[in-house]
Structures are given as structure tokens and as C-alpha cells.
Amino acid sequence: MRVSAVAVAAPASGSGKTTIATGLIGALRQAGHTVAPFKVGPDFIDPGYHALAAGRPGRNLDPVLVGERLIGPLYAHGVAGADIAVIEGVLGLFDGRIGPAGGAPAAGSTAHVAALLGAPVILVVDARGQSHSVAALLHGFSTFDTATRIAGVILNRVGSARHEQVLRQACDQAGVAVLGAIPRTAELELPTRYLGLVTAVEYGRRARLAVQAMTAVVARHVDLAAVIACAGSQAAHPPWDPVIAVGNTARQPATVAIAAGRAFTFGYAEHAEMLRAAGAEVVEFDPLSETLPEGTDAVVLPGGFPEQFTAELSANDTVRRQINELAAAGAPVHAECAGLLYLVSELDGHPMCGVVAGSARFTQHLKLGYRDAVAVVDSALYSVGERVVGHEFHRTAVTFADSYQPAWVYQGQDVDDVRDGAVHSGVHASYLHTHPAATPGAVARFVAHAACNTPRA
């Protein structure tokens, strides 16, 4: 099925992409459309707001994590049942992963993904502090790369009617259509912390109200008919299929419990789909207040912000003990970033699960970026020597016991030969976030281990 899309990009971060993209998703839905929302890059937070606006899962399109060949199929899978897609970009339009030499065209940029899908770009321009200069900016972005088509501009944070008039004249001079002009509106600001926006799950009811406000403002100030008219795509791609990706390798049904709630909010929609395709029953539990579901054979602990909830996580000693006992019985446990912090003995002095011997602490040092990683040892997910591309995104540090076996060794500039994570028995825990669609064998292997082991909580 061919579904047209628009990519919402900007000259730089902080221009209002998430606000405009989320509001556009909500406004199109309010107008009767079924909208498929996407985010370029590995970001887990923005898709949570997209999902609130669209009423369906937000998904990621990241050619660095999954490769170029999967972008079209993952897009086709994600738009099933929709009549239009909105793709929120990352950073500036042409910003992505910089090669070792620097200065090369950046892989994984919004422009890269838009070109792969044939999606026109709507540029969000922060109009504060400028007027006629917008013409030069638009001219530069429109002519920089012939593979990227700027279909229109949405002017954000416009100061007055006179300011808007001058800006529109500048856009006309550059030959770029104005699709909307958003006034400066304080109510559209979302809360942030050291790793970006506060997640929609944590923000709760206020997140829903914020999305409603974004929707109302975009519906009032953006020409939705013009947006729809400029949407486009290349020929239809065959949709990605989780069943074909993993095959049904489980010898018997297995129950996989995935941590959720406010502390564990990072995950890709395709992960649960692939676990089910591999034969698992997927159930969620909240480690802040719940115990493991009855009959749990394996546990997935995704990323999130456990350092915001250390006392609450520590206080639920029942589920901590259950996870420890399940891991000790050889059950597969897959933990990424927040999950790793939850599995160690203590986090900032608070007792955690004690599955991985070591301690973790919050720091002021940001570790952020793509990582080329090689599996150090066979595990419940990967074979020794298997290569993956993942993403690191945290401000914490773990000190492991001397006898630990690392999960990964990183390769590449600035991180060459860095060890990450820990593997023992059925446990695979590390800082590295991976996209399951890129490593379907790991998902199939995890479920097969769960079905064979079946210690059951």
C-alpha cells in the first residue's frame, strides 16, 4: 500500500520540530485522517508524544541502526491502516552520523530518510530575531541537496502580524510556500531534563493536555489542506513482516515480561511484535509497584530513567527478589541501559536486583552516540563475534566486579576497545540500545532460550 508522507525538519535543534510535528499529527487526526507517526533516529521520547497525538504507536526510522534497505519496509509496516504519515526529523535537516573523517554527508539524517522514502520536507523555521534573512536561509536549504525537496515552511514563534507579513514576503522571495505561521505561545513548551524532553508517560495527564494544546494551535495556524497537498512518496515498498523476520523458533510457548511504567519507557514498537512472532506471549509489568506476572519465563528490561525513581524501585523488594531468582535459575534476561542499572547491586546507594555484581551512580558526563559493537561471548541473544550498531544515551556509570564478562567491545573513533555491559548465564545487560529489526536472530534466540528454560516465576 502506498501512503504519502511529509517529513517535518528544521535548520537546527530547538526550532520547534517536536511541537509542530506532534501538533500536526493531532490536527490531521482531528480532521478525520488516520496518521502514522514516525521519528528519524533512535530517539525514544518524541514517539511517546506522537503516539498520544495519533492514537497509535510512534515508530522510528533509523538507517544507521537498521540499514538503508529496511527503511522502506519498516515505513510500509508502520503506515498500515493509515492514510498519511508524518515523519519528525532529527537535529538539523542534514545532520546525522558523522564519518571518521568528518564533513562527509551524514548518514541517518532527516534528508537521508526523506530521500529514501521520496517524502517532501516541511521546514520549521524559528523566526525569532530575524525577518528578511529567512529568504537566504530557505534558499540555502532548498538548493543545498537536489535529492531533498523543500515543499514548504512553517514559521514558528512569530512575534506579531507585522513580523509575519515581512516573513511571508521573504519566503515568497525564496520561492518557498508558507504553510503556517505559529505565534509565540508559552503553553506549547514541553518540560525538559538532561537527556531531552520528559517522557510522555512520566508527564502523564499534563502530556495529554500539552498534546491537545499543540493540536489546537497547529489546527488554527497551519493550512492542513496545503500540507496534505504537498505530501508524497516513491513507489510502495513491501512491508516488513515480523513473522518472516524471526520465524517461529520457540519449541513451546514462552511468557516474556517487559518492564514498563514511568521508569522504563524506552522501547521500539517492533520489539514486542517480534517477540510475539517468535512464539512468545508478551506481558507488561511496572517494577515501581507490581510483581512479575505469573508464569514469567524471561524478562526484558528496556531503557528509561531509573535514576529518577531509585527509592521506589528499591522499595519494591518483592519484584527485585523475583528477578534475581529467575536469573539465578538461568532464565533469559535482556537489559538495556536503565535495565542494566536496575540489575546491578545498587544504584546511587539504593539496593537494586543484585543480578549483576556491581554498582551504578549518576554522573554529569553525557555519553551519547552511535556505537559499532562486537559480541564478546555467546549469550541468550548473540553469538560471539556478532556485530551490531547501537546507540548509547545516558549520564551514569557502572563499576563491575573484577570477574565480570563484558557483553560488547566497541570499535571506532573515541570508543575503540571500550568494554560495555555484562553477560552471565541467561543475562545480557549493557548500556547499548539496539533496534530489534536489525538483529531478528537475537529475538528468536531469546524466545527459544525462554521456551527451553521455562523456570517460571
Curated annotation (Swiss-Prot):
Annotated GO CC locations: plasma membrane
GO biological process: cobalamin biosynthetic process
Keyword line: ATP-binding, Cobalamin biosynthesis, Glutamine amidotransferase, Ligase, Magnesium, Nucleotide-binding
Active site feature: 337
Domain GATase cobBQ-type, first and last residues per copy: 255-441
Any one GO molecular-function label of the UniProt entry: hydrogenobyrinic acid a,c-diamide synthase (glutamine-hydrolysing) activity
PROSITE patterns named among the record's database cross-references: GATASE_COBBQ (PS51274)
Enzyme class: ligase
Similarity section: Belongs to the CobB/CbiA family.
Protein name: Hydrogenobyrinate a,c-diamide synthase
